[in-house]
């Protein structure tokens, strides 16, 4: 019998959209597959992805990842015309798509990409149903974060 491959230590995360958590209240998260071409998978294995400006576009009953940049490798993309900014189809269940359409159309939410990661041999994208933050919400988040840091510093020095 063959042994199971041991999981290599390290992160399975390829890219994160930290700005999305700063600019939006994330109400609900979904995990979606991505429809990719061969050169895109190779560039993702090399970690050449950026989802900072990406969002999810809903049209014709399907969801698409728009604005994500996958930088092509020169070795892997010599015989193919590569478009690093192409729109990629998201693979979701019908129930999940209906939920997304309902919240975006009726309640005024938007859908943003939060992170890109490996799950076994598949590339997955975590998307979030989000509502935009106001400026004062961002300031309160920053104040809360700074207070947590100050609190941990005080506790560290108090224990000495």
Curated annotation (Swiss-Prot):
Protein's UniProt keywords contain Zinc-finger: no
GO cellular component terms, A-Z: cytosol
CDD domains found in the cross-reference section: SmpB
Looking up Gene3D superfamilies in the UniProt record yields:
2.40.280.10
Pfam families from the UniProt entry: SmpB
Disulfide pairings: none
**Does the UniProt entry include the keyword Cytoplasm?**
yes
Primary residence: cytoplasm
State the similarity comment: Belongs to the SmpB family.
This chain belongs to the protein called SsrA-binding protein
Q: Which organism is it from?
A: Sodalis glossinidius (strain morsitans)
Q: What is the lineage of its organism?
A: Bacteria, Pseudomonadati, Pseudomonadota, Gammaproteobacteria, Enterobacterales
